[in-house]
Amino acid sequence: MKHHYLWPILLLISCSPAKKEKCEPIYSQMMVETHGLGDFYCNRHHQAKLDTTGWDYVSGLVAHSVLKAWSAYPEKKAYYDAVKAFADNSLNEDGTFIHNKKGKDALRPSNIDDLPAGNIFFGLYEEEMRQGDTLEASKYKTAATLIRNRLKYDHSRIKAPLPGAGCFFHKAVYPNQVWLDGLFMGSPIYAQWQAKFGKEDTKDNNESWSDIALQFKTIHQYSYNAEKQLNYHAWTATPEDENSFWAQQDGKFKGCSPEFWARSMGWYICLLYTSDAA
């Protein structure tokens, strides 16, 4: 028994640089190579390869994860190349247009689900700048700016005198509805853009950060159940609308969905970290 403390040391020795080729596989790399570069699902649609996959929030999330893995393992150039190919597969030459597999605009009017795949553009921009390819870097900055501007200036919002005025609709087909997962879809890319490029205009930058904060404050104000310490999945400023048939119609949480949703809470926690890190 007295020798059991040696096992951790022996394990470290066995994985020393001199014997690196004999180490067990790094499971995070295995995950990327089996379910990141390919073989994953965009909801119900199977994707065989990341680099040829069309624009979608699921494929975008996978691409962003692969890009993060590449930053941890920069020797894995295939990770970066796959993410870059995924981005380029949906961009025109200068980044002024993002298209879907059919060649149409991938950013549908006021559809917040279409935005988060753009989170990869910041990492691609940084790496292309590091490599000295300013033309490629400019393409990714342009694409990120396109998404940020679509959200800030064109996306439908709740209007006064309704409660929650200024908050983004989840989708145009769901007027005055704010969903917890929708906050994950829009706010991080907005925050990252402001952190990286927003300092060029101080007044606009301050207004934009206030706008981002408003999204968080609104959803928390209307969807948080202090007793349960959870946020309801969705809230609508117009619960009486036919389109808001799911909403509670009276009581303290009028306008909220009747249920909590574990996945949306997970997205909410992730976006708090992502937006704060920006």
Predicted features, each with a name:
Residues 13-14:
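C-terminal motif of bacterial Sec signal peptides marking the signal peptidase cleavage site
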Residues 163-235:
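Aromatic- and glycine-enriched pocket-lining scaffold segments that form the walls
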Residues 273-278:
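Conserved small/polar residues in nucleotide/adenosyl-binding loops
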